[in-house]
Design a protein with these regions (language model features):
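Core subunits and conserved enzymes of cellular information-processing
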Residues: 9-11, 15-233
């Protein structure tokens, strides 16, 4: 019976159609979503250079990229590509333009920005500059990252492959609150990043503590910012 229910759930949710890419107020939502995705990449690049922690997904991808010897952009396409297949099978209705934008753009934006920061000397300021200045930059970057992440999510043009998986798991495991599943999933991503970092001669990339704190705090902040945005979008 359990297997039968699982299969029913699987085939019920695997309803993909290209029409789902064209959402109401498409132009308006796209105008919010696409710049938000690009800015997420910009802010993640700053967080990476400061080295005090990023969002759990970026922490995982950054350390996997370091082990594989690839850029973050290529690694994110590979990792999210695997997650995309899982999402397509078990939650195809969550796929949209935002899914593809998140999967294909953010990592390459991070790589480009880090190259720019390195060439103009901003990278040195972020990693070795005045401590108080770095705290201010980190705080503002975290706030603005949360805002643009909220804009991206509330545009409702598709769910990122990373974000789709806890949604799918929540549909399977209804006895556990979604917030708990999401936090556990984020912590698992941090764990994968740590394991990958242990395999890297250069060690773990980024702060474990910072990434764990962000996994606990980002959700509530994004929810808070998202409430007024829903009136606009």
């Amino acid at each position: 019976m359990a297997i039968h229910c699982f299969l029913c759930y699987t085939f019920d949710t695997m309803k993909f159609t290209f029409k789902q890419f064209i959402v109401p107020n498409f132009g308006k939502r796209l105008a919010f979503m696409l710049p938000a995705v690009i800015l997420m990449g910009v802010f993640v690049s700053i967080l990476v250079e400061i080295g005090w922690g990023t969002d759990p997904a970026s922490f995982m991808n950054l350390n996997v990229a370091s082990v594989l010897g690839l850029g973050l952009g290529n690694t994110q396409v590979i990792v999210y590509g695997i997650m995309f297949i899982f999402t397509f099978i078990f939650g195809a209705q969550m796929i949209g333009f935002g899914t593809l934008a998140n999967m294909l753009l953010i990592g390459y934006v991070v790589d480009l920005c880090r190259w720019i920061w390195n060439n103009i000397g901003f990278s040195q300021v972020l990693s070795e500059g005045n401590f108080a200045l770095r705290i201010v930059i980190f705080a503002f970057t975290l706030i603005f990252f949360s805002i643009v992440a909220a804009i991206y999510m509330n545009a409702q043009m598709g769910v990122a492959p990373y974000d789709a998986i806890p949604n799918i798991l929540s549909g399977w495991i209804t006895v556990i609150p979604f917030a708990v599943i999401r936090i556990c999933f984020d912590l698992a991503a941090v764990g994968i990043g740590v394991l990958a970092g242990k395999l890297n001669p250069d060690g773990i990339q980024g702060s474990i503590v910072g990434s764990i704190l962000m996994s606990l705090l980002l959700g509530p902040v994004i929810s808070l910012v998202g409430k007024p945005l829903k009136r606009i979008l």
